[in-house]
Structure formats: structure tokens, C-alpha cells
Amino acid sequence: MTGHVFHPGHHELHGVTVLLETYAGLSYIGRFDSEDQTGARLLDVAVHDAKGSDLSKEEFVRRTLKFGVRVDRKHAVVPRAEIARVGPLSDVQA
């Protein structure tokens, strides 16, 4: 899918369900909307805090892959400086 843009003029990941991980240990799974100087905007987002949950990040991802995104927030903006990595959820090996 690399290089294919669903909507010309939008980010390559626009409309794709992604796993976004931060340096602080937060993981977001949601539909990628856009990215600008303020950060990445996600829609219909599930959030996992590795420090505040009994559930490991790996189990959070496995459950999401199996049952779908359990939406915690309708939208989230993750500041660019906090993003460790972001990519399609479908690329994650669970």
C-alpha cells in the first residue's frame, strides 16, 4: 500500500487505521486524519498507557486486531515531538 494515497492532496496514511507510539509509553490506535506542525490528528481513537495499565501494549494491540478499536476518544492530536513511530495497524505482527 505504500505510495497509494486514498485522497490526493492528503497524507499517505489518511484514512488508514494506525498504531501510533509515543516516547512516554502511550499507544494510540485510530484512523489517521492528518499531520501538520502541531502533530498527528487521529479519529475514533483507543489509548493505552503502558505505565497505568495491567494490560501490556502487545495484548492491547492483539485485542484491538481481534475485536476492533474500542474508542476512548473521538479525536486526538499527538504532538510531533512525542511521536516515536506511527504506521498501519495492519503491518503489526500480533
Write out the residue ranges for each language-model feature:
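Conserved RNA-binding domains used in RNP assembly and mRNA/RNA metabolism
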Residues: T2-A94
